[in-house]
Amino acid sequence: MSALRSLASDLSDPTTKAAANEIAFKHFSDGIKSTKLSFPYKVDESTAILLEKEGVLTNPFSTTLHTHAAEKMLENRTLNEVGKKLKVHTGPFTFIQFKTGKLGHVGRGHNQGDQIINYAREAKDLSRFETLDTAVVPPVHNRVALLHDTLHFLSPRQLAQLFHHNPNLHLLYATLVLPVEALHNLPSLNPHAYTLEYFSNGDFAYMPGGHAGSGYYHSAETLHWLRAGQIKLGHFSLSLNKEDSFGAHHIFTVTRQFIPPAPRYLYAETELVTLHDIFYPADSNVQRPYPATLINRMELYCRSVKAVSLRDIFAKFRQVTETAQLRHMRISDVIRLANYFLFSASLSGTNDYPSLVGHGLFKKMRVSFQERVKEVLAPLVGHTQYRTLMSFVQPKPFTFSLTPVTFHAAQGRKWSNPLGPMDPPPPGPAGPDEPSDPLIGPTLSLLALGIPDDDLDADLDKIAKRNTRKDELLAELTQTPTKVEVPPAPEDAAGPQNPTTTTPTAADPPTTPADEPTPEAPKHHPTLTAVDIQLLNDLRFTDLDIQHGIDGPILPLHRNPAELTPTLIADINCAPFVEMLSARHIPIISRPVNNARAHALASDVKNAKIGKLLTKQPQDWLKSWDARCSTSELQLNVAVIHGAGGSGKSYSIQETLRNKRETLEHTTIVTPTVELRNDWSGKIPRMAPDRIKTYEKAMLQPGTATVILDDYGKLPPGYLDSYAVLHPNVELFILTGDHRQTTYHVSDPEANTFHLTSEIQEFRPLCAYYINATHRQPRRLANVLGTHSSKTSGGAVLEADMIPDDATVLVPSRVEQAKLIDLNRRAMTYAGCQGLTAKNVTIVLDRDTPLCTDETMYTALSRASESITFVNTYSKEPGFLAKLDCAPYLKTMLTGVHEEEYQPDDTPANDNPTEPELTKTHLPVENDNVFFEPLVEQCTDKDTRELFTAEHGKTNLAQTSSLEVQLFPHQQAKDDALMTETMKARITTSTRDANLRELHDTNALSGLLFEFYADFMKVPKDPMPFNPTLWAESRARAERTYLSKTAAQILNGANRQDPDFPDNFVALFLKSQWVKKLEKVGMQFKAGQTISSFKQQVVLLTTTLALYLRACRNSHQPDNVFIMCEKTSNQFNDFVKDWNFERDNYTSDYTQYDKSQDGLFLNFELRKARHFGVPQAVLDAYTAIKTDAKVFADTLKIMRLSGEGPTFDANTECNIAYDAARFQLSDVKACYAGDDLARDRNCPERASWKYISHQFTLQAKPLVTRKPDFCGWSLTKHGIVKNPKQLWQSMQLGLKLDKLKDIVPSYSLDFHHAYALGDKVYDIFTEEEMAYHQATVRLMHKMGVHPKIAGDHLPVFHITSDRLLKETKPIPALVPTISITPPATPPPEAEVELTTFTTHIPDSRPIRNVHFD
C-alpha cells in the first residue's frame, strides 16, 4: 500500500473523515464532470478497467448507450491528446474530415475562427478516388491542421498532393485507426473495443464494439501506414512520426521538413511468443504466436507426467484455455502445438555435460577439449537429446514494434509504383490570405462534391439563442434592485397599501400562458398598482373587483417593503427558470448556508429524533453529514414564491417544465408528502418519476442544477441548508409555500430543531410578494378565510351525521386518520392535507378540533373546491360547540348549516331452492360403555374440584354418587358458596360519578366504533327519522310476550311490578343449570352465571327499544351477515350452504363478555340508537339505568346484565362492532349471536388496531380453524350439525337423571341435521365423532325416535334477557285489563303521549323525569 493510501486508511476521527470525504467528493465530482463531454457512455466494469489503462475515465452512473461505446471513447481520447498538442501552437487551425460537434474534444470553440474542410461525406469514401481534386474545394489556410481518422483511407500520393496543393500547410496531425495485430492475422488485442474478421485475399474487416453495422473494410496495404516514416514524390518529401497510440487509434505528425523518425514504432505490449521450427516441411510447424504463460504451463505439465500422451496434452490444453478464446484458435495449429509438446517431452531433460567438480587442471583441460570437438562435429553427427532440447525449449519473443520505412508515392491508388512526374498545383478559387468562415467551409466543400451537409451540429443555433437570452436576463437583473414588501397576514392588510415597485419596461411586456385566451381589460382594484394588476393577470386573475372578508376588504396581493438585491446565475441549465422568475418579478437572492440550522437537523437525524429513512443510514454517513454541516461555506441561490392554496404558485413552474423539455433532465422536485408527489407526477407526466421525490429520499439521492421545494413549510427546520451541504452542485432553489398554513411540527422537545423557526419563517423575508388569491375555492368559502377568489359558483356548507363513503375526510389527529384508513376511507389530518385539492371535503369535528391552531384550521378549510361537509362525531352539547368558537374560520363556516334526511329502501329476500333427499346409510355398532372412561380417569375427586369460600364453605356442584354425573357441574340457585364466587367473578361495583366519567372518556372512540359497524353492516349514511308506528308495534309485541307467561310466573314477579320498586334496582340470582360444554366436562369447577331482574316497567321500555332497533337493523342488514335471532335452524343451514371451507375460518370467544360491556359499548349503543331516531328521552332513561344500577352491595359498574331488554341484541351488535373495528371484514360471510361469531375467512387485522386496542377491556380468544362452531352447531360443507360428542354426553346425562323423555324431543330436532346427511357424514366427522354419532343414533332408535322434520322450530335464546318466550297459554283474566291498541295514524314525535315514571336513587332524589309511550 502506498504512503498516502496507508495514511488515509488510518483516519478514524469522524470530523477528519468528513473532511477527507469532502475532498474525495470534490475529486469525484470533478471526475464525473470531466466525463460529460468526451466519455459520457455506459460500459461494463471490465471494459472500464481496460479503458482506464488508456487514460479514459468512465462515469459509473451513466445511462447513455452507444453501439461501440469503448471505441468511441478511445476516439475521443485521441482527440483530447491532439487538443493538448494543438495548445502549443497559435491558432486558428484547419480540421479536415471533421464534424463541428467534435470541436470540444480538441479544446476548440465554435467562435475561434477554425476552418473545417470535408472532402467527402465519410472518410472511407476517399479510398474510391484516385486523387484529391482540390481545385473545387477551399484550400487549407492555416499552418497547422488535423486530418481526422482519414489517413488509413488515403494513399501516399493523396497525402503528398494535400501538402503540394496547400503550400501554407506545414504541420499535419493525422489520426488513423488500424489494428497492429492485423499484420499477423491475430485476434483483436482489445475485444472490448473492436473485433476483426480476416478474408482469404489478406483484407480484413474492422468492427467497433463487434457491431458490423459500424464496421470498415480495409485492404491489406492500408496497414503499411503503421510503419510509414517518410514519403517521397520526386524531390518532394514528407516526414512522418508516430506520436501516441490508444488501442487501434494512432496519432502521426506529418511535416514538410525532414525529421529523422524513431528507430522503431512501439504499438502494444504483449506476452506472445513464437516457437522454433522443429519439423520438416516448414508448414508442419506451429504457425501462430501463443502466450508465454500458456507455453510454459504446457511444457511443465508435459515434463511432470511420467509418460505423457497426445490425448493428455489435448485435455490439458482444453483445461487451461478459456472457452471464449477457443473461437480464435485454429484446430490445425493446435494439433501442431500438441505435437511440438509431445516431441519436447520425448527428449531427455537430464544434463549430459561432464561435471568439473572435484577434477584437477589436466582433467578440466581434457574435458574442455573434448567438448569443443563435439561442438565442431555436431552439425555433422547431431546433438544429444539434452542439447537438442535446450536449443528450442526457450521460445522466441514476439513483438508488435515496427521499423519505419520510406514510401515512394506512386500514381493513383497503388503503393509500389516507381517515382513519377508531379504535376504543378492548379490555381485555387481563393488566395491563401482570403478569410474562411468555419461554418461555410464544409458546406462549400460538400456542395462541390454534390453531398448534402449532414455533419453540421443542429444544436448550435439553439445554444447561441439560449446564451443570448441568458445575457439579456442577467443584464436586466443588474439594472436596479427590486423593492418589495414582506407579505403581512390578510387580517393585517385591510387598509390600502402603497408599495414601492419598479415599473416594468417596454422590453419586458407581460405574458400570458400560451393555452389561455387573451384576457379582457380588467377592472382595476383601487389599491393595486399597474405592476400588481399585470402580475395577477398573468396568474389568470382578471376580476379584481373588491371582495370583502370577515375583517373588511381583501387585497389580492401583498408586497414585501424590504429591499431585495437579486443575484446572477450563469448556469445555462437554469436559464428557463431564470427567465420565468424574471417575468414574474421574483428575484433570486443569494444567501450563505446557515450552519447552525443545518447542523441542528443533521444532529437530530443522527440521534434518531427526526425522520425514518435517514435515521437508518450508516452512522459513518450521518457523522460525516453532521461534520460537513458545521463547516460548509456554500452560498444558496433562492427564489421564494408565497401564495394561498390555488393561487398558481406552481403554475409557471409547471408550464416551464411542460414547454421546455430540456429542463426536465436538470430539475428535481422535492415534496413533503407522498400525496403531493403524486399530484406533481400527474401534472408533469413526462418528467421521470425519480426526479420527483419525497424529502428524505431526495436527501440521499443526487441533486440537479435546479431544485424545486414545493410546500417547503412542511419540511423540517434546517432542511434547505442541510440539503445544500449534501448537494453543492445545485445552482438554484425555488421555494413555494404559504406562511398562513401549517408547518412541520417537531414533537420531541429534546431535539435541536425544536427551538428553530420553521423553514417558511426563515425564508419569508426573501419573498417578493404574497398572492392572496385563489382559483380553487368559491367566494363563499374563500372570502371567509380572507382570500380573494376568482370562482363565483359553488361553496355549499353541509352537515352530516355519518362520514360519506367516497369523501375526502380530514380529521384532527393521526390516530383518527389511521382508524378511518382501515375503513377504506381517504383520510388525512388537518395539517397533513396541505397541498391537496378536492371538490368535496368532509371535515370531522371531535374533541381535538378546538386544540388546533388557526394555521391548521386554515389549511383544512382551504382544501375544498366545491363544498365542505362537517361531521360532528363528538358531542352536540353547548359546551363543546362553544369551544369551537376558538376557531374563527370554523365558527363562520358553520353558519347556516342544515341537515338532510334519507329514508332507506326495503328489499325483500329471495327464496332459496330446496335440497333433494339423501340416501340412507348404515353405521357399525360402537361400544358406548367406554366413552366416559377417559374423562373419569383424568377427573380429580369431588372435594378437590369444589370451590371453597370462608363464609359458606365449599360449593355443591358435583351431584349424586355416579362418577359420570359428577363430570357435569350442577349450578343451583340455593348454593350460597357458588353465589359468593359468582359475585366475585361476574360483578364489579363502582360509583355513578365514575360511570359517568367513563362514559364521557369513551365518547370519541364509540363514534369510530359505530363507523366500523356501519361500514360492515351497510347502515344508511343519513340519520333515520323516528318511526312512531314501528315503536308502537314494538311496545305491543313486548307486552304481548310478557302476557304470554303463566300465572305463576307473573305472580312470582309481583314485587317487581310494584310502583314503589326502585327503577334502578337490580335483583341478582344465581342461574340454575347443568353445564354441558365439552371444555368444562370433567374439569375444575368455576363460577356460575347470574340472573338480574329489573323493574317490570323498565324491562318493557328496554325490550321495546331492543325490538325497535332490531327492526331497523333488519332493514339494512347485508346478505353476507346472519344473526341467529328469530331464525330457524333450516334458515341457518341454508346460509351455511355458500360458506367457503377451502380456506381458514375464524371463530372467537370472549373473556367475561358481559363484564366487559363497559362505557365504550354503552356509548356505541346510544350512538346507534340516535342514528335510528330513538327519542332522546328514551336514551337518557337508558343511560340513567346503566350508569346508576343498584344491587344489594353497591352501584354496579357499567356492564351487561341478563335482565335488560336489549341484552341479546346489544351483545350481538357490540360483537359485530368489535369484530369490524379489529379486522378488515369487507364482504366476508359471517354469523353472529350474542358473544358467539364465526366467519368463513381469517381476515387481516387493521393497522389502526394497535392504536386503539388498549382502550378496550373486552378481550377476544380467537381461533383459526377449518371446522368452525357456532351456537352449538358445527359448520360443514354439507350444512350444520350438532357436535355428536356433546349431544351424546347431554343425552347420557338426561338418561342417568331419568329425564330423557323430557329432553329427547328437542334433542331429536338438533340430531336430525346430521342424521339426514346419510353417507355424507363420512366427509365431515372424524373417527371419534363417527363413534359418538352412531351411539346417538342407536340410543334414539332404542327409544323409538325416528326424526323426519327438523329445523323449523325457533331457538329459545333469541330473547334470553327477559325470558318472555315460553310455549304456554296466557292468563285469560289478565288479558282484558290492558289495552294494546296502537293508534291508526300515529302523531308526530313531539305529540306522542308518554307515561311518566321517576328513577330513584337511595337518597330519594329523582335523577330526572323520563317519558315513555
UniProtKB/Swiss-Prot annotation:
Sequence ranges of Low complexity compositional bias: 499-515
Keyword Nucleotidyltransferase in annotation: yes
EC number of this enzyme: 2.7.7.48, 3.6.4.13
Domain RdRp catalytic: 1143-1249
Pfam families according to UniProt: RdRP_2 (PF00978), Viral_helicase1 (PF01443), Vmethyltransf (PF01660)
Any one GO molecular function term: mRNA methyltransferase activity
A Gene Ontology BP annotation from the UniProt entry: mRNA modification
Chain positions covered by the region annotation Disordered: 413-444, 472-525
Ranges annotated as biased composition (Pro residues): 421-432
Protein residues bound to ATP: 643-650
Residue ranges of domain Alphavirus-like MT in the record: 59-226
Cysteines joined through disulfide linkages: none
Boundaries of every (+)RNA virus helicase ATP-binding domain copy: 614-771
Domain (+)RNA virus helicase C-terminal: 772-905
Catalytic reactions of this protein: ATP + H2O = ADP + phosphate + H(+); RNA(n) + a ribonucleoside 5'-triphosphate = RNA(n+1) + diphosphate
Keywords, ordered alphabetically: ATP-binding, Helicase, Hydrolase, Multifunctional enzyme, Nucleotide-binding, Nucleotidyltransferase, RNA-directed RNA polymerase, Transferase, Viral RNA replication
Reported function: RNA replication. The central part of this protein possibly functions as an ATP-binding helicase.
Protein family: Belongs to the potexviruses/carlaviruses RNA replication protein family.
Official protein name in the record: RNA replication protein
Source organism of the structure: Botrytis virus X (isolate Botrytis cinerea/New Zealand/Howitt/2006) (BOTV-X)
